[in-house]
């Protein structure tokens, strides 16, 4: 009898077929179970200790999963979903993980019945198309210029977060920041929150004293103590070049034969710095901000001309100042012209917050960049407020691009679930089971909302199903009490973009993991 032939390395860990699929499903369910309690206004907080030793307190799905270390490839894939959701729409990170985990859990008994994964994927894709059209039917348009409607929408996003107590303030901050950085070029709207809406966190004070500055704030002080620290309507010059003696680009050797040569070298250095300052003084600015250094001699010449200087600012800060006050960033002082001077700023002043000095450029006429100043009792709380505010700004930005609202409180998910269950009856053969499984799985969102506020899920879901069967698609769960309420009256709305992206991402990731029938864990070769 022939001995067995080993083609694959026997040291590696390998799972094949049904075992591999069940392993993926178990991993996905485990990740979903971690953040299941983080959904809704009664969400629990997670306390995480990161490798550096600092504590993270949050109920934001993406922030939690980012800190968790997992070994299973399917679990890593699930965590990637939360990142995608956060980058695309900014909200719904917890929902998408719970949905994906539940859809895969619903696929588990179907695999046990020996239904082929390809048949299931076909039904899942059909269910996805139908779900997207159902969401489109029950959405309402929103007027992005109406502050009351926008506030109601953003309040829903942050109602489940730590900052729910200060929801009016956060709505105001998020909406004002998004409106400030919105710009239209070539007939196309651009809202770049990441680049032009900077969040500056200063521990101390009260959360209520947080505000949006119509300009820019920097953690900088003037370079010379006698320079002016308050200037009204300043003329601003932005530079990307040093105000110091330009040394040789590479190593330079100079041979000195007389002592006068040495003095002449020093004079040349001074002349060069003076020439640089003369170029600046010629356009009569009040404030010079450079990304590079400013020498003591340059400070002296600028001080004599009554010009204030700031040095070593970040490139991103310089870009935001340029957007806020209308200045152009100059790379060579020889090219500095009157048109490069920014005159859009109303007030420049330096103020002390806590132990640090900060530069404020405020009162800008038409700022296309802003700074959000966050205050709070501790670093941990301010970090969580910042995460919540980023979500709120992302939601506001999405509504500007996609001005449609879906009812919140699990109403949209229940409407999709009930309508898909009705459609499942008209499907013949084995394909009906996976289709029905998606319908049942999407119901997990309202069920989790009820469970998280300690109410009876069976009673609440039966009542909610009955309302939706009658065609009342705006009924959902009040996340505070677990009662069934009409979202039109209750006023909980979410952007359609968040709902569409959640269901798309969840079903597509479930399809991806179901197609996997072989997991090979490679083992590194041990050095001899």
UniProtKB/Swiss-Prot annotation:
Keywords: ATP-binding, Chaperone, Cytoplasm, Disulfide bond, Nucleotide-binding, Phosphoprotein. CDD domains: TCP1_gamma. GO terms for biological process: protein folding. This is T-complex protein 1 subunit gamma. The gene is cct3. The keyword Nucleotide-binding applies. PANTHER family: CHAPERONIN. It comes from Schizosaccharomyces pombe (strain 972 / ATCC 24843) (Fission yeast). One of its GO terms (molecular function) is ATP hydrolysis activity. It is found in: Cytoplasm. Molecular chaperone; assists the folding of proteins upon ATP hydrolysis. Known to play a role, in vitro, in the folding of actin and tubulin. GO terms for cellular component: chaperonin-containing T-complex; cytoskeleton; cytosol; nucleus.
């Amino acid at each position: 009898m022939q001995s067995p032939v080993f083609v694959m390395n026997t040291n590696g860990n390998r799972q094949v077929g049904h075992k591999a699929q069940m392993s993926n499903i178990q991993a996905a369910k485990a990740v979903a179970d971690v953040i299941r309690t983080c959904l809704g206004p009664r969400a629990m907080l997670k306390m995480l200790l990161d490798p550096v030793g600092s504590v993270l307190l949050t109920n934001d799905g993406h922030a939690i999963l980012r800190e968790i270390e997992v070994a299973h490839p399917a679990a890593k894939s699930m965590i990637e979903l939360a990142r995608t959701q956060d980058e695309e729409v900014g909200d719904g990170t917890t929902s998408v993980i719970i949905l994906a985990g539940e859809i895969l859990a619903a696929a588990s008994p179907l695999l046990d019945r020996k239904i082929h994964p390809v048949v299931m994927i076909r039904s899942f894709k059909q269910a996805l198309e139908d779900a997207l059209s159902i969401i489109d039917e029950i959405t309402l348009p929103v007027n992005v210029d109406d502050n009351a409607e926008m506030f109601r929408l953003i309040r829903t996003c942050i109602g489940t977060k730590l900052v729910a107590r200060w929801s009016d303030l956060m709505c105001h901050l998020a909406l004002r920041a998004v409106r400030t950085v919105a710009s239209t070029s070539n007939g196309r709207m651009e809202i770049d929150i990441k680049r032009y809406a900077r969040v500056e966190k200063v521990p101390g004070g009260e959360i209520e004293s947080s505000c949006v500055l119509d300009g820019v704030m920097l953690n900088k002080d003037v370079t010379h103590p006698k320079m002016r620290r308050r200037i009204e309507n300043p003329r601003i010059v932005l530079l990307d070049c040093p105000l110091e003696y330009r040394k040789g680009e590479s190593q330079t050797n100079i041979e000195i034969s007389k002592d006068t040569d040495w003095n002449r070298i020093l004079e040349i250095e001074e002349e060069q710095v003076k020439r640089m300052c003369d170029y600046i003084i010629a356009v009569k600015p009040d404030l010079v901000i450079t990304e590079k250094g400013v020498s003591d001699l340059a400070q002296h010449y600028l001080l004599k001309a009554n010009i204030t200087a700031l040095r070593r600012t970040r490139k991103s800060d310089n870009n935001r100042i340029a957007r806020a006050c209308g200045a152009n960033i100059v790379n060579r002082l020889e090219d500095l012209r009157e048109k490069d001077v920014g005159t859009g700023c109303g007030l420049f002043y330096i103020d002390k917050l806590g132990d640090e000095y900060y530069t404020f450029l405020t009162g800008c006429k038409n700022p296309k960049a802003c700074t959000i100043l966050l205050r709070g009792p501790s670093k941990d709380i301010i970090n969580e407020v910042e995460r919540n505010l980023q979500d709120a700004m992302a939601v506001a930005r999405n509504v500007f691009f996609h001005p449609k609202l879906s009812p919140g409180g699990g109403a949209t998910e229940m409407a999709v679930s009930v309508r898909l269950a009705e459609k499942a009856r008209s499907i013949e053969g084995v394909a009906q089971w996976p289709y029905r499984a998606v319908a049942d799985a999407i119901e997990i969102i309202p069920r989790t909302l009820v469970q998280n506020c300690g109410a009876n899920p069976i009673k609440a879901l039966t009542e909610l199903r009955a309302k939706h069967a009658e065609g009342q698609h705006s009924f959902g769960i009040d996340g505070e009490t677990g009662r069934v309420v009409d979202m039109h009256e209750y006023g909980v709305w979410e952007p359609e973009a968040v709902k569409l992206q959640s269901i798309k991402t969840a079903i597509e990731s479930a399809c991806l993991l179901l197609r996997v029938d072989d997991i090979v864990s490679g083992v590194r070769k041990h050095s001899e």
